[in-house]
């Protein structure tokens, strides 16, 4: 693969197979052979990967005294460069770039939703607006016009309301001269196809994480390919975890070979990250996805062993206390399906005073809307005012969010006025609300009455769980999520407040201790960090000595729509489609293959799982279980026997087809 120079190539790489190192060596080899840097383009999936690859490539170039390195870009940054050049040549109209999720974009979505549904209202169902947002994004990335949706029989089942909304969306973008990041990709492809634009002549195009590309990104690669261009793509179908935004496993499992003739296949099937037990259980889980059969991971014989442990009903606090005794100097990741699941470990780490960081945009718990609501309610209950959070830099945002989450009925402009007034006079919140809010309005009267009553409730107990119960009984959490029109955000907020209840019922935390953690969390020196908190999606491409997976109740992952009610947190099961389950299984595969030394999975107590292991089964349960179905598929008992067989080939074990295949791959 390193010496491959002519013809297209598809590299299928398992986790930890050293694909980045191999790609660096290949690019370095091309440069050493005299291939001009400007004739090579390397496309990465995201900014972090782009920066990391560029840094490593520069180090390699310096080692061999190479004067320059090729362009290493993300798809969007490269497409934006083409669009800007098109604008300079007057081939494309100048438009303002608007970020999806920005207030301007959210307002545009609202307008389209109202138009599509032929209503005049200020209320938007969160699930409906997110459905519209995802549909619009995918339609734009598939280059579909409103006419396509109306005239093509393939789209006859799409709701007419969504078709009207999409038509309005396209019209508004043109009217306001706006473009999104999705549009940048489409416009770049259209520019290349126009034959009016001089496409850069590239001899080598390398695309990393190809399993995550969508239709328009694939079209961009095709558009950049000329007779002299050699394209190499690298990826792993088992790590395709972005289907919800257009990625498809078949781009790497068939489409590339269809579009790029005479493709040579390279398989990097040996991992240098983890030991045989983890390789085996990962193979066992992912084998349930029928499109994964071409990929089979084995560990390099010199890899150290990786232990896989399933903990039923174990408290995270207990595991961390034990981990501190055993792995004082190891790196550890606590990984969950959603950001809401990470609330518990963050508070536990604060209680234990262990150095950690959160790998997400919201660096502090109080920056989560539902947690800031809980925090301010507790301040009002204990202190009667908000003076305790004076040191907080984003106080005005906290006040605004507090008012929005409580869902006072306010006339236009009053939200800002009320926010500003309370921000200036934190000690007089009740009088300000009484003065500026129409308390005669029924909902406002109920909310104000509840706020006044919670102060007297605080004397009943100094435990945070007791106060939470009071807030919940008074309905102060009922309107959580209304501050966001995006369903994925609102669901996460509902889930977050629900997990706070579980946490406070599990640990005895006083109100003052909880407020100290939420308002003034202990911050740690970056060089001393030993714990990372991240979602499964956020863990991709990373590795740690130890990985702890949490939130593994089957109702929560993968078998739900992530919409818990309050306070009955997880009683909301629904069946996911087969494709959804495949993607969630791939996500689980990504998460477990981040571990080097030890993989811990915390699951609820489940007698069915004990029965499964006793019978040495690895099939997917057909009946409801407590633990996620994916741990049933791990074939953990056989994996342990396999490790003993590898250590001592004379050991006799009962071979299954999968364990025999693994041993054959090792020539044992």
Predicted segments with their positions:
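Conserved helicase NTPase motor core
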Residues: 1-18, 71, 156-253, 270, ...
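ATP-hydrolysis module of ASCE/P-loop NTPase motor domains
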Residues: 67-69, 88-177, 405
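Conserved RecA-like helicase ATPase core segment
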Residues: 218-306
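C-terminal accessory regions
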Residues: 553-668
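Conserved helicase core region in the C-terminal RecA-like lobe
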Residues: 72-81, 205-209, 234, 338, ...
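Accessory C-terminal helicase-associated subdomains
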Residues: 388, 392, 433-544, 557-559, ...
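ATPase/helicase motor core of nucleic-acid motors
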Residues: 78, 258, 326-458
């Amino acid at each position: 693969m390193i010496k491959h120079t002519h013809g297209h190539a598809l590299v299928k790489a398992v986790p930890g197979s050293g694909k980045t190192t191999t790609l660096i060596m290949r690019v370095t080899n091309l440069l050493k052979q005299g291939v001009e840097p400007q004739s090579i383009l390397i496309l990465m999936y995201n900014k972090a990967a782009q920066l990391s690859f560029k840094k490593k490539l520069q180090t390699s170039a310096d080692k061999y005294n190479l004067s320059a390195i090729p362009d290493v870009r993300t798809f969007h940054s490269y497409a934006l460069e083409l669009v800007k050049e098109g604008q300079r040549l007057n081939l494309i109209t100048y438009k303002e770039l608007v970020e999806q999720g920005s207030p301007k974009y959210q307002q545009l979505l609202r307008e389209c939703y109202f138009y599509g549904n032929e209503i005049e209202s200020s209320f938007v169902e969160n699930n409906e607006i997110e459905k519209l947002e995802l549909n619009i994004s995918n339609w734009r990335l598939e280059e579909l016009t409103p006419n396509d949706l109306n005239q093509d029989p393939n789209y006859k089942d799409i709701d007419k309301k969504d078709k009207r909304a999409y038509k309005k969306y396209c019209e508004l973008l043109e009217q306001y001269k706006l473009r999104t990041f999705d549009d940048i990709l489409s416009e770049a492809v259209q520019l290349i196809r126009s034959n009016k634009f001089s496409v850069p002549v590239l001899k080598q195009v390398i695309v990393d994480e190809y399993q995550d590309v969508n239709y328009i990104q694939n079209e961009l690669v095709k558009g950049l390919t000329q007779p002299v261009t050699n394209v190499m793509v690298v990826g792993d179908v088992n790590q395709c975890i972005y289907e919800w935004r257009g990625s498809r496993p078949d781009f790497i499992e068939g489409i590339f070979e269809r579009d790029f003739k005479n493709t040579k296949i390279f398989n990097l099937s040996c991992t240098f990250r983890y030991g045989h037990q983890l390789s085996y259980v990962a193979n066992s889980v992912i084998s349930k996805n029928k499109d994964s059969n071409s990929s089979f991971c084995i560990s390099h014989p010199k890899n150290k062993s990786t232990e896989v442990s399933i903990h039923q009903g174990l408290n995270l606090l207990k595991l961390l206390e034990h981990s501190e005794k055993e792995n004082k100097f190891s790196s550890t990741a606590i990984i969950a399906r959603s950001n809401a699941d990470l609330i518990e470990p963050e508070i536990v780490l604060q209680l234990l005073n262990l150095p950690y960081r959160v790998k997400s945009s919201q660096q502090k718990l109080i920056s989560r809307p539902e947690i800031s609501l809980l925090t301010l309610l507790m301040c009002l209950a204990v202190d009667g005012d908000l003076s305790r959070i004076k040191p907080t830099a984003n106080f005005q945002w906290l006040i605004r969010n507090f008012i929005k989450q409580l869902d006072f009925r306010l006339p236009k402009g009053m939200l800002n006025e009320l926010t500003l007034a309370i921000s200036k006079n934190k000690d007089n919140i009740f009088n300000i609300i009484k003065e500026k809010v129409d308390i005669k309005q029924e909902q406002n009267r109920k909310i104000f009455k509840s706020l006044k009553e919670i102060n007297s409730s605080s004397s009943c107990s100094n435990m945070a769980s007791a106060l939470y119960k009071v807030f919940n009984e008074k309905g102060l959490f009922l309107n959580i999520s209304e501050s966001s029109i995006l369903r994925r955000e609102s669901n996460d907020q509902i889930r977050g407040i629900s997990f706070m209840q579980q946490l406070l019922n599990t640990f005895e935390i006083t109100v003052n201790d909880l407020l100290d953690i939420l308002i003034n969390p202990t911050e740690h020196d970056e060089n001393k960090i030993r714990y990372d908190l991240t979602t499964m999606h956020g863990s991709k491409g990373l590795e740690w000595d130890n990985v702890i997976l949490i939130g593994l109740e089957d109702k929560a992952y993968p078998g739900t729509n992530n919409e818990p009610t309050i306070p009955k947190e997880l009683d909301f099961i629904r069946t996911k489609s087969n494709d959804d389950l495949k993607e969630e299984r791939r996500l689980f595969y990504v998460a477990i293959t981040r571990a080097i030394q030890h993989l811990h999975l915390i699951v609820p107590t489940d007698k069915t799982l004990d029965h499964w292991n006793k019978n040495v089964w690895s099939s997917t349960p057909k009946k409801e279980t407590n633990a996620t179905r994916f741990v049933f598929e791990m074939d953990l008992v056989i994996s342990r026997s396999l490790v003993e067989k590898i250590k001592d080939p004379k050991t006799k074990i009962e071979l299954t087809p999968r364990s025999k295949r693994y041993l054959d791959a090792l020539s044992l």
